[in-house]
């Protein structure tokens, strides 16, 4: 069996995920766990992915021996899990990345002190697919080197 057959044998057939995979491969793109694939999605593809994922999450719950039929806490949990993964936990995968903006900060007319920024970080471990939450603190100051170059 060739390596290409083994690599492609896992792919679902006739699904929205398969259509997206074909677009990515045609573009010679990559779709690893940490990659942003938003440029390959049509407007309603996220909703279609949720619909495709829902019965799969229901199957996981069934395999975990959770009574989805009678447990009111588990009613529609497959859909909620699918929505959570697409719209929240992995939203950076399916939405365009934001543009970063740089602002000038010249010593003569700018802020001269230490800038400290605390940013909340929400991510997903690409190995275990579990949420990772934290805070990153970044501090920097404007600096003029002896050569009059600004840093």
Question: Which functions belong to the PLM regions below?
Answer:
Residues 3-16, 20-135:
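Active-site loop/lid in soluble adenylation, ligation, and acyl-transfer enzymes
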Residues 137-139:
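Acidic, proline/serine/threonine- and glycine-rich low-complexity intrinsically disordered segments
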Residues 141-147:
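Conserved small/polar residues in nucleotide/adenosyl-binding loops
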């Amino acid at each position: 069996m060739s390596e290409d057959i083994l690599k492609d044998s896992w792919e679902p057939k006739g699904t929205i995920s398969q259509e997206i995979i074909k677009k990515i491969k045609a573009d010679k793109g990559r779709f690893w766990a940490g990659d942003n694939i938003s440029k390959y999605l049509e407007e309603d593809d996220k909703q279609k992915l949720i619909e495709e994922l829902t019965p799969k999450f229901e199957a996981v719950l069934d395999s975990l021996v959770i009574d989805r039929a009678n447990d009111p806490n588990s009613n529609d949990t497959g859909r909620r899990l699918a929505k959570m993964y697409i719209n929240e936990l992995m939203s950076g995968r399916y939405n365009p990345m934001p543009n970063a903006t740089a602002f000038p900060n010249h010593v003569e007319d700018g802020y001269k002190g230490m800038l400290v920024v605390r940013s909340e970080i929400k991510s997903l471990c690409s190995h275990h697919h579990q949420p990772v939450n934290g805070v990153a603190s970044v501090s920097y100051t404007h600096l003029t080197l002896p050569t009059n170059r600004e840093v």
